[in-house]
């Protein structure tokens, strides 16, 4: 794997190369999850996650989609929107003039989760210093929400603009509520953009399914992301990381928008993507590596194999072991499809992988 043949991402302007991160780089490799968690019990989820991901690792506020409508990632984020409302139709979440019962249900579920988090954290002898929360980013939000006529909001320039602005306005209140639940905790935000590559490529289907929507402009995508990321930082986020699938992942666009790092699975990363990640790490950015494949249903990979999946390309690119502290290891996807016992095992395995990377870093 060579780093001499580097081709810039077409979504990023030449003048907007990643600069030094504003967030402090971790001193050692750590572990976290991506948010989705099995079951319907926020108390059990919080206890397990905070128990398995104690310091220096990164516990997270669980998303529990098994509870139904409003606890899914899209509905949870839609409930944060300022001066915009949603309801649910047979084809999905729809923008409306007044909040529907599903939006109220989403807001209620989030309030419950924050109250439970406050209780669990308050009962700990030694509370975690960091906490991660997740939300859907403006591009995937526009792809997932529908207009009054049933078409995707992504189709309409004004709707895209209003959604990004509404989300940016709403995240401040959300982070203040999280901070009140866990006073003194350093907040990390994971912005999920599962549809970003499809938005940029023009492969999102219309409501009818017979056509696809026009490819989104990279410049507009970058500015929408920048607006939300800046709002998160202004609201107190210490780190903001963009998470997306690895296929056609717009790594340089994400960093040009101001992200402190990117989170993506390792399984299908190309040489070019590894080169982009190497440049980002050297510039002080973080890489959240989806080292643990949880999509196959097979037994979890061995710790040594997971460590090697990072170290081999890392070493081939000439990156020093000392920079392994810029890595957080994650599963390849959310854990909602696992059993609670399996999900717990995944978190334990991830902390072991982080330990293995730290041993390499120490030489």
Tell me what each language-model feature is.
Residues 1-136, 140-155, 253-260, 285, ...:
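Alpha/beta catalytic barrel-like cores
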Residues 166, 170-269:
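Active-site loop segments of alpha/beta catalytic cores
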Residues 260-363:
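Catalytic-face loop-and-helix region of soluble metabolic enzyme cores
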Residues 102-119, 162-174, 304-309:
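Glycine-rich anion/phosphate-binding loops
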Residues 146-161, 204-216:
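A solvent-exposed, charged loop/short amphipathic helix patch at secondary-structure junctions
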Residues 132-137, 181-192, 325-330:
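Active-site groove signature of glycoside hydrolases
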Residues 117-120, 174-178, 221-232, 276-278, ...:
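Structured alpha-helical segments in the cores of large, soluble enzyme domains
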Residues 137-139, 193-195, 246-248, 268, ...:
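Active-site-proximal loop/turn and secondary-structure-junction residues that shape catalytic pockets
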